[in-house]
Amino acid sequence: MIKERIFTVDRPEFELHGVIVEPETIIPDRPFVVIPNSGLVHHVGTCRSSVQFTRALAKAGFLALRVDLCQLGDSSTRLDNESMTDDERTIQELQAVLDQVITDYMLEHTAKVVMYGLCSGSQNSFKLAVKDDRVVGIMGIDHFGFQNWSYYCVHYVKQVFRLSPWINRFKKLIGKAMPMV
């Protein structure tokens, strides 16, 4: 039988809250899964998707956590230095989450984590993975939208074949060339 319990990271600068779902038996060599909130949606996830996913992971034998970063859902506002960038704050918060899970479940020697995220949760997972060797995988949905050459090709091709801008330009040209009397 899986168990769900409240998860808290209590630091002087911030306090984070979430729900951790435990499998019947925790296997120390198995990675645990962390799901940071996405955008303004708290740890329940879009249409409770994070709830359903963490429960399914626990039934499959994985320790799984859904958590709110600062200023979202149940978590507090940060009380510390304003000189940190948003990325630095996010990485610090997620590393504190990993540290707390590792301490609570005595996973010091085998700590591996897979991050799962939707949209900004995916981006935050990627940022953490770049900085923290404990992250062994990322499952990201709607991760990044880079504006590369194909983006611009599609964008401008659509613009060229839209009729209304051409008509508006033609009307402006005629209006300037032949003033209305």
Positions of PLM-derived features:
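N-terminal cap/lid segment of alpha/beta-hydrolase-fold proteins
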Residues: 1-31, 87
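Short, surface-exposed "cap/lid" segments of acyl-processing enzymes
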Residues: 24-68
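Active-site loop signature of alpha/beta-hydrolase-fold enzymes
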Residues: 41-42, 72-75, 146
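Glycine-rich "HGGG/HGxG" loop immediately N-terminal to the catalytic nucleophile
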Residues: 67-84
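Alpha/beta-hydrolase active-site loop
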Residues: 82-104
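Alpha/beta-hydrolase fold nucleophile elbow
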Residues: 105-118
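Short glycine-enriched nucleophile-adjacent loop
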Residues: 117, 122-133, 138
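The alpha/beta-hydrolase serine catalytic core
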Residues: 134-181
